[in-house]
């Protein structure tokens, strides 16, 4: 029989092999020519298997052979390898040549070795019938197409034939049926359901098993399976079990009775009620006033247990830990906003109703360092008018609280007033007197007021320094950010009204214009708004360049008209000092000053939108 199986010596290129029959007795069989891209592994279908079997012994050298080519795809290889073990092939040496390894030999005339073709290309090939199905099969999901019309083996668990569920659309019945099968109640199925049955142990006698089931025969729908454990009974409250032989330890599906789906609905399982001592019970199950009904008539007691399994279950009281405490929740969750909250970090973010003027926005561009800022640097704080200057000066505690409320407050140093020399006070008096004499109509009164005011300020300063009080309170109007509260002797320019010292004369002039007077020499050329400082005008000019709306600010001259002084000396003095100092640098003054003591320290140059030039003469 060695010649029966011929190894096809095919080259690696995979040329097709030919099987031919020279004798006339074999001419009735069709000639087969294999091709690499056709279904070669089925071989030639023989019409006369008996004649072929005789020819197999008579002329073994002419036996038609099926030779698979190396270029078979993976599907054909895997299908043929499944039947390789059933062949009685000729033993070959273990190290085979590389061109012979993929060659697979299958005997042609053995129909039992032919694999199933699930594709069913044509009727020329073998088509074995499918696996016999179960009793009833309503599903052919994931099954190959049938060639002979027989049902295929179902591969899912939804093979029961269900009745139509009311209120379900067509096409959705399978989802509903799967949900019904997932539950423990399979009474809707027409076939015997897989009822969970508790198998009694071997120690239980037949008389005991018949005694357990005797009370449950009349009502098979409400008869749970006997269980020695009460917890398992609660987990399966609707198990359906009918009478069975007393000597059996297993459930025979043929003797089970199935309740019709048209019958009365099953009752809820008897559960223990949750007893609460409060007037309004709060059940943990979610509702505030719902309690489950009490079922007095429970299922018949079992002889395997001494007492009712449900009666021995503990009762549940109300959980006080789960009740919501309003005080605890409100204190944690409710965050009421505080009404007096102010954001001092941003200059333009304000929540209070302040009287805002653009003069109050001070810019550090015109200062040499942070110590040169004046005491009345107002950034988002209430403005101080010139008429109520003494009222603000007398209110010490309120100003101190406003200073501490700023975001970038520095540590305060001790307030010490250094005694100024008489020469500096005399020179300041001479300067102010010369400025006052240059002003027409105010020469006599202004000079007299300046001398008296300066002398009184210097005398009070000298008395304070001589008494050696280390923390003598100065004017509480010092609200600038990060400034030195001790007077530096190098700051020669002293304000005669508030004793504020400056290194530059232009800072002193700006201090007078911003705080002590209401003169606004800088005017916006687009909207006509006037400002007392050039940097405020430059800041205002950006609003026109960006196309934003210019907000009107209340004129401070007309807002407060009640004088806080008995005599108008501070206003007249401030106007005289400003115009005298601005005479040499600005063309908008009313008189020309020829005094050489007040030099040209800064030049605005008639261009208020540009930066001021600084020339130190200290």
UniProtKB/Swiss-Prot annotation:
GO MF, one example: RNA polymerase II cis-regulatory region sequence-specific DNA binding
Name of the protein described by the UniProt record: C2H2 finger domain transcription factor sebA
InterPro entries attached to this UniProt entry: VerF-like, Znf_C2H2_sf, Znf_C2H2_type
ZnF C2H2-type: positions: 493-516, 522-544
Principal subcellular localisation of the protein: nucleus
Source organism of the structure: Aspergillus fumigatus (strain ATCC MYA-4609 / CBS 101355 / FGSC A1100 / Af293)
Keyword Repeat: yes
Biased composition regions of type Basic residues, renumbered to the chain: 406-416, 608-618
Disordered: region residues: 394-488, 582-618
Lineage, highest ranks first: Eukaryota, Fungi, Dikarya, Ascomycota, Pezizomycotina
Swiss-Prot/TrEMBL keywords: Cytoplasm, Metal-binding, Nucleus, Repeat, Stress response, Transcription, Transcription regulation, Virulence, Zinc, Zinc-finger
BP GO terms, sorted: cellular response to calcium ion; cellular response to heat; cellular response to oxidative stress; positive regulation of cellular response to oxidative stress; response to starvation
Localization annotation: Nucleus; Cytoplasm
Superkingdom of source: Eukaryota
CC per GO annotation: cytosol; nucleus
């Amino acid at each position: 029989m060695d010649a029966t199986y011929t190894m096809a010596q095919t080259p690696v290129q995979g040329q097709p092999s030919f099987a031919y029959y020279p004798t006339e007795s074999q001419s009735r069989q069709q000639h087969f020519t294999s091709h690499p891209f056709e279904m070669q592994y089925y071989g030639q279908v023989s019409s006369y298997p008996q004649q072929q079997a005789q020819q197999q012994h008579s002329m073994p050298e002419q036996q038609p052979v099926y030779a698979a080519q190396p270029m078979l795809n993976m599907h054909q290889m895997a299908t043929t390898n499944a039947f390789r073990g059933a062949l009685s092939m000729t033993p070959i040496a273990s190290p085979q040549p590389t061109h012979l390894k993929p060659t697979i030999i299958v005997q042609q005339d053995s129909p039992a070795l032919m694999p199933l073709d699930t594709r069913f290309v044509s009727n020329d090939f073998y088509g074995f019938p499918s696996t016999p199905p179960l009793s009833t099969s309503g599903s052919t999901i994931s099954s190959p197409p049938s060639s002979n019309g027989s049902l295929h083996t179902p591969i899912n668990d939804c093979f029961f034939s269900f009745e139509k569920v009311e209120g379900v659309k067509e096409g959705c019945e399978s989802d509903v049926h799967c949900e019904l099968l997932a539950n423990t109640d399979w009474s809707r199925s027409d076939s015997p359901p897989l009822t969970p049955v508790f198998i009694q142990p071997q120690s239980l006698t037949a008389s005991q098993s018949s005694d357990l089931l005797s009370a449950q025969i009349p009502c098979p729908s409400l008869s749970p399976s006997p269980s020695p454990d009460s917890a398992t009974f609660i987990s399966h409250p609707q198990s359906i079990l009918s009478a069975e032989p007393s000597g059996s330890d297993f459930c025979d599906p043929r003797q089970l009775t199935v309740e019709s789906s048209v019958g009365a609905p099953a009752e809820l399982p008897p559960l223990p009620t949750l007893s609460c001592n409060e007037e309004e019970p709060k059940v943990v199950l979610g509702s505030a006033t719902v309690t489950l009904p009490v079922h007095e008539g429970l299922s018949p007691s079992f002889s395997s247990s001494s007492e009712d399994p449900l009666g021995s279950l503990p009762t549940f009281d109300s959980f006080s830990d789960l009740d919501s405490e309003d005080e605890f929740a409100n204190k944690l969750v409710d965050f009421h906003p505080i009404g007096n909250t102010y954001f001092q970090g941003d200059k333009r973010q304000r929540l209070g109703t302040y009287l805002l003027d653009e003069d109050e926005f001070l810019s550090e561009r015109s200062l040499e360092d942070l110590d040169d800022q004046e005491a009345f640097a107002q950034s988002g704080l209430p403005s101080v008018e010139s008429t109520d200057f003494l009222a603000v000066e007398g209110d010490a505690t309120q100003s101190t609280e406003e200073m501490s409320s700023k975001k970038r407050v520095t540590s305060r140093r001790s307030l010490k007033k250094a005694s100024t020399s008489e020469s500096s006070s005399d020179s300041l008096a001479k300067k102010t007197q010369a400025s006052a004499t240059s002003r027409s109509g105010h020469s006599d009164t202004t000079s007299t007021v300046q001398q008296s005011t300066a002398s009184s300020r210097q005398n009070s300063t000298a008395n304070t320094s001589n008494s050696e009080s280390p923390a003598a309170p100065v004017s509480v109007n010092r609200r600038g950010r990060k400034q030195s509260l001790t007077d530096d002797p190098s700051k020669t320019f002293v304000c005669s009204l508030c004793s504020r010292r400056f290194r530059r004369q232009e800072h002193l002039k700006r201090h007078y214009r911003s705080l002590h007077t209401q003169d606004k020499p800088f005017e916006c050329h687009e909207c006509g708004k006037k400002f007392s400082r050039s940097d405020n005008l430059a800041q205002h000019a950006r609003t026109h360049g960006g196309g934003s709306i210019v907000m009107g600010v209340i004129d401070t001259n007309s807002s407060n008209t009640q004088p806080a002084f008995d005599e108008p000396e501070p206003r007249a003095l401030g106007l005289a000092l400003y115009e005298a100092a601005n005479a040499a640098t600005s063309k908008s003054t009313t008189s020309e000053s020829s005094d050489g003591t007040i030099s040209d320290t800064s030049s605005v140059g008639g261009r208020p939108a540009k930066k001021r030039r600084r020339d130190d003469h200290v």
